[in-house]
Amino acid sequence: MAKVRVYELAKEFGVESKVVMAKLQELGEFVRSASSTIEAPVVRKLTDALQGPGGNAGKSAAKPGAPRKAAPAKPAAPSPAAAARPAAPKPGAPAPKPAEAPSSTPAAPSAPSAGPRPGPKPAPKAAPVTPVPAAEFSAPAPAQPAAPQPQAPRPAGATPGPRPTPARPAPAGGQRDGGRDGGQRDGGRGGERGGDRPARPAGQGAPRPGGARPAGPRPGNNPFTSGGSTGMARPSAPRPGGAPRPGGGQERPGAPRPQGSGPGGAPRPQGGQGQGGARPTPGGMPRPQAPRPGGGPAGNRPNPGMMPQRPAAGPRPGPGGGGRGPGGGGRPGAGGGGRPGGGGFAGRPGGGGGGGFAGRPAGPGGGGGAGRPGGGGGFGGRPGFGGRPGGPGGRGGTQGAFGRPGGPARRGRKSKRQRRQEYEAMQAPSVGGVMLPRGNGQAVRLSRGASLTDFAEKINANPASLVAVMMNLGEMVTATQSVSDETLRLLAEEMNYVLEIVSPEEEDRELLESFDIEFGEDEGGEEALVSRPPVVTVMGHVDHGKTRLLDAIRKTNVVAGEAGGITQHIGAYQVSSEVNGEDRKITFIDTPGHEAFTAMRARGAKSTDIAILVVAANDGVMPQTIEALNHAKAAEVPIVVAVNKIDVEGADPTKVRGQLTEFGLVAEEYGGDTMFVDISAKQGLNIEALLEAVVLTADASLDLRANPEQDAQGIAIESHLDRGRGAVSTVLVQRGTLRIGDTVVVGDAYGRVRAMLDDNGQNVQEAGPSTPVLVLGLTNVPGAGDNLLVVDEDRTARQIAEKRAARERNANFARKGVRFSLENLDEALKAGLVQELNLIIKGDASGSVEALESSLLQLDVGEEVDIRILHRGVGAVTESDINLATGSDAIVIGFNVRAAGRAEQMAEREGVDVRYYSVIYQAIEEIEAALKGLLKPEYEEVELGTAEIREIFRSSKLGNIAGVLVRSGEVKRNTKARLLRDGKVIAENLNISGLRRFKDDVTEIREGFEGGINLGNFNDIKIDDVIATYEMREKPRG
């Protein structure tokens, strides 16, 4: 047997697919959709369930006298007209019995019946009902499926009189009693309240008077009809023969039902074997049926195998209809339409208040499945209509179906944690309506150039909230943009956090620790350490003879090759000197003395063991002398003072010793511990004594040992881009031994060592501790002062270099430019107050480029002009630099480099300004002048002269003419003037349009002369007024 799909079975049974799916779920078979297939055993089980006592869907086609016609009603139909009608009866034929009205009264307003009543007694109805004459059936209606009709309520305790038992149509969908409310089954409310239900009188299914239904429109569940009823409600008067009323009349509030398991709780009379009332199907779907004999069986009796998966519960507390089990008024899981107390699957007009398959135990008038009045909560509950007796319309739910308790949702007590969280949320800081976490002084560590997203991750906040806060604080920042340290600190203070910016050294240490690399410590024990040469840095003021001293020591002439006679790079050299009969090696590092090279001097002091402070005997202590002294003290290195130029006229070494005493350097002859040596680098005097002092200081106060067997570590002294060699770097090996072929990482550059050169230009195979070498093979030019590391793999070197580059890039982004607030940005742009000078810097060495960039960024010529360095690099000016300058209107600065190849021709063709410098202070002075040229000119008022009005002449052509005597200065034509009267300004910004002396037009009148002045259209002048003339002259800046 082929597999059958769910929708095919639904079509065969004449029901909707969701009804079959719900029944399958009740049977424990779960399907995904209506297109799912099911196995043959499941089909048989479903067929037995639907044709058995649980519902007779699909059997109506086999009934005689009724054509099979599937007419499933949509759940959202607002009227019972969607329900099928019975086959057209002939006059005198038994009419189908309408279903009883849904119960909408609470569960216990009327007393339950103690047992079966022998004879039903007629009870007075609340309002008379006009019987419908049979003559109204003028034409038979087309055959339609029978639909259960809600029956009007009857008072509890009153039983209907006996009725004849003609054949009547079976209830929709094969509905039969016995499975609902009371009856012979226990576990439901009816069984608890009244024991076994009495048999229904045979006259229950009697036809209406006249034997035919009215031919008019069938009463529908119109939610907009008056009187709180959804059908065509009629007064509840007794009808002849006790025939049931048609229509969906709804019970009045508090009106008890006559019998059965509704809210009244009294058992209903039973007629023979055929049970009265429509029995619900699993979906509450009607189906066509033929009239059935009154005493005939109403279908298979229910059996325990048709019970739901969970035992039916007892009466549920609260209003919910008189049904059993989780379904409220209907059968558990199968609340069919038609019987009182149960809502249908699709919300057919069912019993009052009870829940269907997933109906919530609702109060009187609870929301039905399709929003029908009085219906219980259906499978797909629709909002009930308002205005029903017993309270406003509710909404169907699923509380009764899956084990959740019914009744209104209760608000549980909040835990201490919830209450504390709510309290903390109320106390949290708020900026501009944005709630922020409370820091309570907690420390947050962030790296340089961190973004708001990084900050939000640290404090478990939403980055969008931080962006909104920054907008309220007047800063335009995106979530992923690098933010300056000051901005982050401002934001942290708003939330009561303590922000800690990680230093570059700490960042680098954490980065290396992530790769299990330690920098700055010797490996091995004491036995692995060997002595190494001392590293000596020569520091001092510019032109005090530092490089000349090194030339004297090395017996070379470096000074002759330096531009401007000043050192602009760090040079590293190693010399051998005989001290006390022993050959000792000393490594010297020459640092610049110009003020622009502060960073170079700081790096030289950090990478050294001993500092030689060179002071000219004729100049004494100078600003850079003090700065170099402070660098050495900060690096905690011993200092040897070399008093140079003792052979120059006016030299006074004693004065130098006295000046340095003020800064904590006390000579040994004055009782201190600092060695002073008087030398002459030019004459070569006392050079050996200076080297001896250096060696003695190193031996006395320093432990100069290192492990040569470990991986090399060092520092980059200087780097540049060589035309034939590529990126090269002068490095000082501090520990370990550097060999050719080692994988190294220097700052954000990495590579393999292809070659090494010493300070004399000779190739070397390895370099031990305290040895300066020139390294070739790096991917790019590293920065001066970057650490050198030897790693095991190229991949590790690349990862370290890339992370360092990204970190530095973020830090640069955070430092770039001047940010404007939301309030003043628009005005600044409109007024043209923001002027930028774009620069591209190219130099011969990384240290020189760094020094030039630092000096230019420190230029301050006002807030109106800003320097923006678009690019900096080492090497010649290339075509890409010219292209960048063309697109951004930038100036290219070449420091000790020239334009290469076609770059110079391209610069001339594109009109790019390329400036070349060899001395750093020349570049700084010219850039400062260019910045001042970008400033808006400032004007000042200059008084030219004053004239007193002695006479007034009137002219019909020119107006009033003032006859004046010039008191001071001179009065010129077409200059600005103001009119003073009794020392007060009467008129401003006047123009001297005419100037005459007697009858001649003149351009100026000097002091002491008379003349005539015409002030244009201004005629309000009087005798003794003073005319003061002035002009606006441009004021020089800076």
UniProtKB/Swiss-Prot annotation:
Check the record and name the PROSITE patterns matching this protein: G_TR_2, IF2
* Key words of the record: Cytoplasm, GTP-binding, Initiation factor, Nucleotide-binding, Protein biosynthesis
**Could you tell me where the Gly residues compositional bias lies?**
261-277, 319-406
**CDD domains hit by this protein:** IF2_eIF5B, IF2_mtIF2_II, mtIF2_IVc
Q: Where is the composition biased (Basic residues)?
A: 410-419
- Renumbered residue ranges of the record's region Disordered: 48-426
Region annotated G3 sits at: 590-593
Show the segment(s) annotated as G4: 644-647
Span list, region G5:
680-682
State its role. Answer: One of the essential components for the initiation of protein synthesis. Protects formylmethionyl-tRNA from spontaneous hydrolysis and promotes its binding to the 30S ribosomal subunits. Also involved in the hydrolysis of GTP during the formation of the 70S ribosomal complex.
Kindly provide the name given to this protein in its UniProt entry.
Translation initiation factor IF-2
